[in-house]
């Protein structure tokens, strides 16, 4: 077993391994930020609960503002400079949160940090796709989730220790990790944008630039429908991360350190089970996977609506982790398979925008519902997840069937790539 793993890592492309490292760093930073930011805002910063979601929205809003303009920039200037600049920029933004005071300044820092983050995750996925064959994309995207989740174990665990001193100090740890990742990328990553691209795949010189060129969802109807259902599914699922810290804290179930430990446990499940779950369900259809993820999320919401007790909190985050194991690798695999090689970063940026909407709308809507009634997010989330999971499965199924020729005809690639999940 150990020899097999060592052989795999030796044979793996270095850019893909660096991509996994950056996912780990980003996961660490997110894991340190997300569980503790609401607690820091409501206790140390004196921000009303109803406004916490708006600050989360500033971070995601920066991504949404920047993505239409620079989302596909890695297709034009290269992957390496984009990854270096974005990782250092996000890290510097997290470090700045340690020093800032006041709602307005915090909102500005989060907005700028979100702008830098708008190209980080999609470009990492693009680098991995550049240097690995399509048949291996599901495995590598699963490994990316494992790497991110490993960071999300250490992030909340480190944050739980730092929270004993000061909630603000978790930002310092998260920012430092991303800056280190950017420095490693600077010295170790080579350019990958020309790998695996045929001569005919280059973009025409006179092709339009701007919004329609960078956001192919406006031209590829299959991608647009797919991303719509992703947003609906992920918005409701995001309420677990955004609302549980407040829900558990107000009920007296968990301290800030306990919240960090809970999310570290959820990430540990992904690290330990993601590859196993992927192998177990590889013969299942995409529709089966999305419905299974929807049922797991609905059951988690039902548990939370019943009680904020510790067993239900553990059960809920466990079920949501399983749901993400089912659909997490499937979505980037389908999006990447739709993308022509010359537009790979742009398609990934469009997918990232869907996630950004989740990060913006999820906390905003979830905390607003929580301000009205503590159990309202869970009650409202059950029918929303049911509809979204059915729609997402149908959208992926339609994407696998040829409908009309699209740029560079990516349909055969989509069929073969998503077939790994059938």
Language model features: what each stretch is:
Residues 1-13, 191-227, 415-421:
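Juxtamembrane intracellular "pre-TM" segments in multi-pass secondary transporters
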Residues 30, 112-124, 320-331:
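Core transmembrane helices of Major Facilitator Superfamily
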Residues 36-50, 242-258:
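Short amphipathic helix-loop junctions that connect adjacent transmembrane helices
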Residues 60-68, 152-153, 267-275, 359-360:
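Residue-level signature of mid-helix packing/kink "hotspots" within the transmembrane helices
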Residues 66-78, 273-286, 370:
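Helix-to-loop junctions at the C-terminal end of transmembrane segments
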Residues 81-95, 288-302:
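Structural signature of the two symmetry-related core transmembrane helices
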Residues 110-150:
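Cytoplasmic helix-loop-helix junction between adjacent transmembrane helices
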Residues 343-371:
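A late C-terminal transmembrane helix in Major Facilitator Superfamily
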